[in-house]
């Protein structure tokens, strides 16, 4: 049986490589305050060639790992999306944190209850231009509201100089989060397939637009001459499992190992009735 996460990480790795190698050429320009690129990939586990998984095609991130330091024992404060991102971006442990944790913090911040800066706010206070593109905090683009595009509801106030989320054919950031090709959006009333292999370019999915936007911003920031902290968040391999067909074709003749534990766990605490996964066709 093929591993879903294995198949769908190759597109994101291709996009990541372009950003990383563009940035590496700029690091020497700001020796005292080097430029910093943080790359977040949603739901990507360490099923990569550089972690010993030899059937995965991940040459670009493998080169990145070989040129730096790869962590083979790494732990996070929380196993869920919003809580883990909260901890990463604030340095705080928030027991019981859910996906709205950063919005909770924003409310406390506005009320004067928090004095510690967030990670990007710290860089901002020390002379960096800070920019967020894609899904860095829980909401792509960092805004709240029905479609995650209300500028009056900011997930991380006083943190980012620029916060961007290209929406393309998907209308709004909420649509981008649950996107399939040709502007299709999970939760819009149409029952969609959880799998999709679309015969198109990288921009057929939001991650292609995110990478394209990030590359343009890096070039613009480099021309400004000031140091920057840029965070770029890719959405795949989060549900739904859609990617350009050219990446899936790399695995056409690949025999992936069977899933180690294919059956439902015995104990209820180990099983979740996913509200996302169960709503696809």
Where are these regions (language model features)?
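N-terminal secretory signal peptides that target proteins for export/translocation
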Residues: 1-13
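Serine/proline-rich low-complexity intrinsically disordered segments, especially terminal tails, linkers
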Residues: 5-8, 19, 30
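Structural motif marking the loop-to-transmembrane transition
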Residues: 12-16, 33
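Sec-dependent N-terminal signal peptides
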Residues: 16-27
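Formylglycine-dependent sulfatase
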Residues: 27-281
């Amino acid at each position: 049986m093929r591993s879903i996460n294995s198949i769908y990480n190759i597109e994101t790795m291709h996009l990541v490589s372009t950003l990383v190698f563009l940035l590496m050429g700029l690091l020497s320009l700001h020796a005292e305050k080097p430029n910093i690129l943080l790359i977040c990939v949603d739901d990507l586990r360490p099923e990569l060639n550089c972690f010993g998984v030899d059937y995965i095609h991940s040459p670009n991130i493998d080169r990145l790992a070989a040129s730096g330091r790869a962590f083979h024992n790494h732990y996070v404060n929380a196993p869920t999306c919003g809580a883990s991102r909260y901890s990463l971006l604030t340095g705080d442990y928030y027991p019981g944190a859910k996906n709205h944790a950063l919005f909770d913090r924003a409310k406390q911040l506005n009320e004067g209850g928090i004095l510690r800066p967030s990670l990007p706010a710290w860089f901002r206070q020390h002379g960096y231009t800070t920019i967020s593109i894609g899904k860095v905090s829980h909401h792509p683009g960092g805004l709240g509201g029905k479609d995650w595009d209300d500028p009056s509801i900011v997930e991380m106030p006083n943190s980012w100089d620029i916060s961007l989320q290209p929406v393309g054919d998907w209308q709004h950031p909420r649509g981008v989060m649950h996107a399939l090709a040709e502007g299709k959006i999970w939760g819009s009333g149409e029952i969609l397939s959880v799998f999709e292999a679309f015969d198109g370019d990288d921009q057929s999915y939001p991650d292609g637009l995110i990478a394209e936007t990030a590359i343009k911003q890096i070039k613009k920031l480099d021309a400004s001459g000031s140091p920057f902290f840029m965070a770029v968040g890719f959405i795949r391999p989060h549900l739904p499992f859609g990617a350009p067909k050219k990446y899936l074709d790399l695995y056409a003749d690949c025999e992936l190992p069977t899933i180690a534990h294919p059956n439902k766990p015995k104990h209820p605490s180990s099983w979740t009735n996913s509200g996302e996964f169960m709503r696809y066709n």
